[in-house]
Design a protein with these regions (language model features):
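Two-component/phosphorelay signaling modules centered on CheY-like receiver
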Residues: 12-30
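Conserved acidic carboxylate
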Residues: 9
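Active-site residues of response regulator receiver
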Residues: 53, 83
Length: 121
């Protein structure tokens, strides 16, 4: 059975890149465009892992992460921030919100897949 990954990303091009990459290694992909949609999708589908953009149109990925991690069923689900935020301290904000890992855009596809596989080992 393939692992389910929820991609919370508002930019269509970025969602397509992530979807194609993840599908190429047989992960099932669920997509969400906003923080609210992402939280709802996480609760409905209980994915094995979440890729979280930080800059979202309604509330940011930090808030979405906090809401997801507040649900006891979803607390153990790993969340990897995949974001263009690369200033000093941005990674700390993500970790404080509950993200388990932090990857900056543009990312290396091989490095991102390696990071994902760490959680499925």
């Amino acid at each position: 059975m393939s692992k389910v990954i929820l991609v919370i990303e508002d930019q269509e091009d970025n969602r397509r890149i992530l979807r194609d990459l993840l599908n190429s290694v047989d992960y099932e992909v669920i997509e969400a465009v906003t923080g609210e949609d992402g939280v709802r999708s996480a609760m409905a589908h209980k994915p094995d892992l979440i890729l979280m953009d930080i800059q979202l149109p309604d509330f940011d990925g930090y808030e979405a992460t906090r809401r997801i991690k507040a649900n006891p069923v979803l607390t153990p689900v790993p969340i990897i921030a995949v974001t263009s935020y690369a200033l000093s301290g941005d990674d700390v904000k993500a970790f404080e919100a509950g993200c388990d890992a932090y990857v900056t855009k543009p990312f290396s596809p091989r490095a991102l897949l390696a990071k994902i596989r760490e959680y499925f080992a």
